[in-house]
Regions:
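Structural signature of extracellular appendage/secretion-system components
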Residues: 1-531
Length: 531
């Protein structure tokens, strides 16, 4: 037989369950603008009916419901959308870093403009043409020297500026690695707290949110994967457990966070600039590998992410040359190497022609440029030869004693269009240059077309980076909108829920009033006769 107070207990349970739902709704509304917050909902389930099956069960028709209970408060989140978002976030981080590095390089190269290298060299070639018309004119000779000095200074400016930006990118890499290690440690700490709470049968939803927010941030720097591991004990079935975060090194997983342990990311050949024992700064020779708490991973294992984009700008090693020196590739190392090749080739070929000509005083074998004994660093070391201090030594003539002969000035102006693939180049008045014997680093095209090709490729790379950045941003935004449609707080929806739960609460309270009136009639209104 049912208890007289059975209805009171069922109504009380209804009030408590609806109250929990109202409190959760209040929590959602309060955090509507909190970054990373996932809306929560109370899972309601009926309590076990009465009676339970057994030999001594009361003889009543069927089982009677006993009310409702809040089984859990859980997040409304779709894990698959998290995976999609983090993948797109990694791609966006990579293309943002690459686009930024190229944009800074384009600002330095400043093509086309009146102060860039191509324009400066055009003015130098034009000065040589003018000198060929007036080889005896001291003003024309002075202009040639000044234009040559402008070319040298432009090489220096470009080389120094690109080197400085590369250094700045290296500093940015160090800051990024420090931030990555900080995020890993914070995720580890959250894993610890979650592992202490879940076995007691609770869902630490706010800790889950904070952990997911940190992993979202981490995905901007590196392409990562996440594995879930149960914490055991009395954890609820929907408990998310601890997260293991990893990167792929080929087909092997390298764990950045594993339960309550966080790895440290560093550069084996790098330097520790803040004294914390972590080599967060990349080596000056370029990145070869990364160290993850003793596990070495290749730079190429970083498929996407801001860190890879920065390293590609800064420079990475691809092996060693015949002398055992590392071969460094990357946006800035490549452009610096190209400028060195250009400065060396330009200066060497120009000198080879100039030294065969004659000055006003009949002297010959005077170099015009100096400081180009090696290809490496030539853009920073090239300078005007001391012989050019005497303007009479500028070799505009192809014949000794013919001061009005400007044919060698024409030869010098034609250096801009010499095909570097030719073994030997013949010029006016029997002057020729054996290009094959000069061991030039550029062996195709011309001095001019090589530079134009590099600038053109820079423009193409910049356009591609900006296009991919825009595409990645659009895709990430699309996934984020889907994720927000599932997980974010809708104030309109919460207001409807509030009204729904309020009415249910009021109905349960009214039920108690009804039962109270029934009991009052039973207790106080029965068994009294004659009143």
């Amino acid at each position: 037989m049912l208890s007289t107070f059975h209805g009171l207990e069922a109504a009380r349970r209804g009030m408590m369950a609806q109250q929990a739902a109202l409190y959760t709704t209040s929590h959602n509304i309060a955090n509507a603008n909190t970054e990373g917050y996932t809306r929560q909902r109370v899972q309601l389930q009926p309590t076990p009916p009465f009676p339970t099956p057994g030999l001594n069960r009361p003889n009543i028709p069927g089982q009677m419901g006993t009310g409702v209970e809040a089984s859990s408060v859980e997040r409304v989140r779709e894990y698959f959308l998290d995976i999609q978002y983090r993948g797109e976030n990694s791609k966006l981080g990579y293309w943002e870093a690459r686009a930024d590095a190229i944009a800074k390089m384009e600002d330095i190269m400043n093509e086309p403009s009146d102060s860039e290298l191509a324009k400066t060299m055009d003015q130098f070639w034009q000065a040589m043409q003018d000198l060929s018309v007036n080889p005896e004119n001291e003003g024309a000779r002075s202009v040639v020297r000044q234009r040559g000095l402008a070319v040298v200074e432009t090489f220096h400016y470009l080389s120094n500026s690109l080197t400085q930006i590369r250094t700045d990118i290296g500093t940015q890499i160090g800051t990024t690695v420090t931030e990555i290690n900080s995020l890993l440690n914070q995720i580890r700490a959250l894993n610890e707290r979650i592992a202490e709470i879940e076995p007691n049968g609770y869902l630490p939803n706010d800790l889950y949110d904070e952990r997911d927010r940190l992993i979202d941030q981490l995905s901007q720097y590196m392409e990562i994967g996440v594995e879930k591991h149960p914490t055991g004990g009395n954890a609820l079935p929907m408990a998310e457990g601890t997260y293991d975060v990893y990167v792929m090194n080929g087909s092997a997983k390298v764990y950045l966070v594993q339960g309550r342990t966080a790895s440290v990311v560093s550069f084996p050949d790098g330097s520790d600039v803040d004294g914390d024992g972590v080599k967060e700064m990349p080596p000056a020779s370029g990145v070869n590998t990364l160290d993850v708490s003793g596990t070495t991973i290749s730079f190429t294992a970083l498929a996407n992410g801001k860190l890879r984009g920065l390293i590609e700008g800064y420079g990475y090693q691809t092996g060693t040359d015949a002398s055992g020196q590392p071969i460094v590739k990357g946006l800035y190392p490549d452009m610096l190497a190209n400028l060195d090749k250009l400065a060396y080739t330009f200066g060497t070929v120009f000198n080879a022609v100039h030294q065969q000509g004659y000055g006003l005083n009949g002297s010959t074998n005077h170099p015009f440029f100096d400081g180009i004994s090696a290809v490496s660093g030539a853009a920073n070391t090239i300078k005007l030869a001391a012989d050019t201090d005497d303007l009479a030594n500028i070799a505009a003539s192809t014949k000794s004693g013919e001061t009005g002969n400007g044919n060698n000035a024409i030869n010098l102006a034609n250096v801009r269009s010499l095909l570097l693939s030719n073994a030997t180049v013949s010029l006016q008045d029997g002057i020729s240059v054996n290009l094959a014997s000069l061991n030039l680093p550029l062996s195709s095209g011309t001095v001019e077309t090589n530079y134009q090709g590099w600038i053109g490729q820079l423009g193409v790379d910049g356009e591609q980076a900006n296009r991919m950045k825009t595409n990645s941003e659009t895709l990430r935004q699309s996934v984020e909108e889907k994720r927000q449609s599932v997980s974010s707080v809708s104030l309109d929806e919460e207001m409807m829920n509030m009204i729904k739960f309020q009415h249910a609460y009021n109905a349960a309270a009214r039920q108690i009033t009804v039962i109270d009136e029934m009991l009052d009639k039973l207790i106080n209104g029965m068994g009294v006769v004659g009143r």
